[in-house]
Regions:
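Active-site alpha-helical segments that house and flank conserved acidic catalytic motifs
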Residues: 1-27, 34-64, 127-150
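Divalent-cation-assisted or electrostatically stabilized phosphate/pyrophosphate-binding catalytic cores
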Residues: 17-38, 67-108, 126-129, 151-191, ...
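Intrinsically disordered or highly flexible coil/loop and linker segments, enriched in small
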Residues: 52, 122, 141, 193-197
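Long amphipathic alpha-helical coiled-coil segments
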Residues: 59-63, 67, 191-205
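A mid-sequence, solvent-exposed acidic-amphipathic segment
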Residues: 98-142
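Histidine/acidic-rich helix-loop-helix segments that form or flank divalent-metal centers
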Residues: 125-128, 202-210
């Protein structure tokens, strides 16, 4: 989003939890602030879901820490916050019911990413929404694929749990993931991005597979 909209960026340095002693270089702009806000929203609702489903005390505690910030974000992004919360709730309900439709599950998470990518209502909104949707599906499917063995072992939900034992499973998933990234890259190439193109292409065409 920063590469597309090229907002004014402030450069500086600051300490953080990971680097409490030595200051680290940072860049701030309206896009990084938006991304941070979306990260807080997703983290909060994920913690609430973990508390309600598994009664994780740490998740409850973290959600309490974020609660004040989230109330402000709900006011700042009322429609987006409401849609993301609704989609996360739908995803959680489908997981609880043991939904077997992989495309439906991945599509739900894709819609969440679609909302996040749609920063502004402008000429690029539709392209960014499609890019976010397919990237979201890729992320969900890759995460499920990486966790399938452990989830089966621990008797946790995984949309691939039944397909896992089928011959050619790995190749089937690989093809699906390639399709998702192909669509993601197709939308990316429609954007008039000049800055950071080499880095972004390296991530989309190579980095996501590492």
């Amino acid at each position: 989003l920063s590469a597309l909209h090229e907002p004014h960026t402030q450069k500086g340095s600051t300490r953080c939890i990971i680097h409490p002693v030595c200051k680290q270089p940072v860049r701030r702009n309206t896009v990084t602030e938006y991304a941070a806000d979306m990260n807080v929203l997703l983290t909060y609702y994920k913690c609430r879901d973990d508390w309600e489903d598994e009664k994780k005390v740490t998740a409850l505690g973290y959600s309490k820490v974020l609660q004040g910030k989230v109330k402000k974000l709900d006011q700042k992004y009322p429609d987006k916050s409401r849609r993301i919360q609704k989609l996360l709730s739908e995803l959680s309900e489908m997981e609880k019911s043991g939904e077997k439709d992989i495309d439906k599950m991945a599509g739900c998470f894709g819609k969440i990413m679609e909302e996040i990518f749609a920063w502004k209502q402008d000429v690029w909104e539709d392209t960014l929404r499609r890019m976010g949707f397919f990237l979201g599906k890729f992320i969900y499917l890759l995460d499920a694929y990486d966790d399938v063995e452990e989830d089966i072992k621990n008797k946790n939900y995984n949309p691939f749990s039944e397909q896992y034992i089928i011959e050619g499973f790995d190749e089937q998933v690989r093809r699906i993931l390639i399709m998702m990234m192909a669509q993601t890259c197709r939308e990316f190439e429609k954007l008039p991005i000049i800055k950071y193109t080499d880095i972004l292409r390296n991530i989309l065409y190579s980095g996501v597979w590492c």
